[in-house]
Swiss-Prot record:
It is an enzyme of class 2 (transferase). Substrate binds at residues 69-76, 135-137, 148-150. Pfam families: LplA-B_cat. Keywords: Acyltransferase, Cytoplasm, Transferase. It catalyses: octanoyl-[ACP] + L-lysyl-[protein] = N(6)-octanoyl-L-lysyl-[protein] + holo-[ACP] + H(+). CDD domains: LipB. This is Octanoyltransferase. SUPFAM superfamilies: Class II aaRS and biotin synthetases. The gene is lipB.
Length: 203
């Protein structure tokens, strides 16, 4: 069964513990369900496995979590929708295909509100003509996934100036509200619709 669970606003540690608990249960076969956890985080930086010291400039009093996902450092905060799929992928679905599907969820969501978004060669995430609107960083072990994707709705971009987001020096971060007026709860509903449609192809 595919379950969509809205955690509301969370501290990063809380959401990480939920993911890890379900992830371990799925690895052992104790949990046969598949989950998309949705949240907004209180301010936090997360640093993936390719983070270099020069990618973190000055995070001041905001915590930094070094975690086991792909990618470099990013910021999470209010005004950003974060989606954590904890899934058992169908046989033969590659990590590349899985990431493609997560990106597709975002591309189709923002297309509904008139934003043209796309992928870039050799980069993960979703981009627009005004900058990067969504980041992707995942871990897949024995076909089970964790971590995920974050979509910027109206997040405070100043926090991204304290890091080199995703290790990309020359592409700014952008919000949905750089293009159109947007209510985060309405965007979330559109996102969930595409999560259900695309997510069923993965499990």
């Amino acid at each position: 069964m595919l379950k969509i669970i809205d955690l509301g606003k969370t501290e990063y540690q809380e959401a990480l513990e939920i993911q890890n608990r379900i992830f371990e249960r799925k690895l052992t076969g104790e949990d046969q369900d598949n989950y998309f956890f949705i949240t907004e985080h209180h301010p936090v930086y997360t640093a993936g496995k390719t983070t270099k010291p020069e990618h973190i400039l000055n995070t001041e009093d905001i915590p930094v979590y070094y975690i086991d996902r792909g990618g470099s450092v990013t910021f999470h905060g209010e005004g950003q929708i974060v989606v954590y799929p904890v899934l058992s992928l169908k046989n033969r679905i590659s990590v590349k295909r899985y990431v493609f599907t997560l990106e597709e969820i975002v591309i189709k969501t923002v297309k509904e509100i008139g934003i043209n978004a796309y992928r870039k060669d050799r980069l993960r995430g979703v981009f627009t003509d005004k900058g990067k609107i969504a980041s992707v960083g995942v871990k897949v072990s024995k076909g089970v996934t964790k971590h995920g994707i974050s979509l910027n709705v109206n997040i405070e971009k100043r926090y991204f100036r304290r890091i080199i987001p995703c290790g990309i020096w020359d592409i700014p971060v952008c919000n949905i509200t750089d293009f159109v007026e947007a209510d985060i709860d309405k965007i979330k509903l559109k996102l969930i619709k595409h999560i259900i449609k695309e997510g069923r192809k993965l499990v």
